[in-house]
Amino acid sequence: MRIEQDLKLGFKDVLFRPKRSTLKSRSQVELTRDFTFKHSGRQWSGVPIIAANMDSVGSFEMAASLSKHNVMTAIHKHYTVDDWAGFVKNNDAAVLNNAMVSTGTSEADFQKTKDIMALTEDLIFICIDIANGYSEHLVEYVQKVRAEFPTKVISAGNVVTGDMVEELILAGADIVKVGIGPGSVCTTRVKTGVGYPQLSAIIECSDAAHGLGGRIIGDGGCSCAGDVSKAFGGGADFVMLGGMLAGHEESNGEVIEKDGEMFMKFYGMSSQSAMDKHSGGVANYRAAEGKTVLLPFRGPVENTIQDIMGGIRSTCTYVGAAQLKELTKRATFIRVQEQENNVYGKE
């Protein structure tokens, strides 16, 4: 047993320090980023926000809507190959280039991924997604997928430390997904005692990834646009959002009417709700590691994504970053004990 004494920080532990800026307006800030990925050699240009691959977030409808802003969606893995065939038939490259095909690590998952990727050349992203990215099995699976799809962009996770980021990149991942336990409907940290404050995880993992020419996704922990900016400021190349994009028309969640008001069900992918739906209940050797909540129905996602992007642009003007890619270079974080004045309630 050992104890690490270094302080680890989450998004609520810091604020950006403002800096002199030559920018006159938020409209001058460029949020689009251009990436060339290490192993696949693929190029991608867009706003590096990703809707999470959760049942009630990462839907085909969400992908079609967010692609209008060049924002990505990681499509959840519970659609069938036939579902994907319909989606491919009804959408063009502008949508498909911004859709990630999510998969687990079983033999059936591998075959299903092959069948989906065979539908069109316009699908270029594969997201290998398991809760515990520290499994040796994940490294072997990444190698297997890389051998099968040498020109596709592969994302793998989730992990929170630089050593595992490096191992996954060396195994063939272009992007590593970073985050264990920070999500709004995730209870892994409570059930297992395992986790890592998200901002520190992003700072440390981005350093490891960038040293090898890889990229990272900061996955989880964002509850407002300021948190998304902090993730980018910490070095995340992409930021994945679940709860912030849940509860919308395009989220594809179950709508429930209660006392005359409309709500949408939102749950973690290791929750009782998810396992009841996809696995016939919680297996007797495990515990649910997610919660189920009802969110007020929020209408179309358009206003929300505009609000998030507007917040990031505003962050950039405060620190003098004319482009999103400059934000991490311009960022100085100050440690704080309060974020906002809540005398009239929270934002």
UniProtKB/Swiss-Prot annotation:
EC number: 1.7.1.7
Top-rank taxon: Bacteria
Protein name, as recorded: GMP reductase
Main function: Catalyzes the irreversible NADPH-dependent deamination of GMP to IMP. It functions in the conversion of nucleobase, nucleoside and nucleotide derivatives of G to A nucleotides, and in maintaining the intracellular balance of A and G nucleotides.
Catalytic activity: IMP + NH4(+) + NADP(+) = GMP + NADPH + 2 H(+)
Active site: C186
Subunit composition and interactions: Homotetramer.
Binding site for K(+): G181, G183
HAMAP family: GMP_reduct_type1
Residues involved in NADP(+) binding: 108-131, 216-239
Gene Ontology CC terms, in alphabetical order: cytosol; GMP reductase complex
Chain's gene name: guaC
Family from the record: Belongs to the IMPDH/GMPR family. GuaC type 1 subfamily.
Any one Gene Ontology molecular-function term assigned to this protein's record: metal ion binding
Keyword field: Metal-binding, NADP, Oxidoreductase, Potassium
One GO-annotated biological process of the protein: purine nucleotide metabolic process
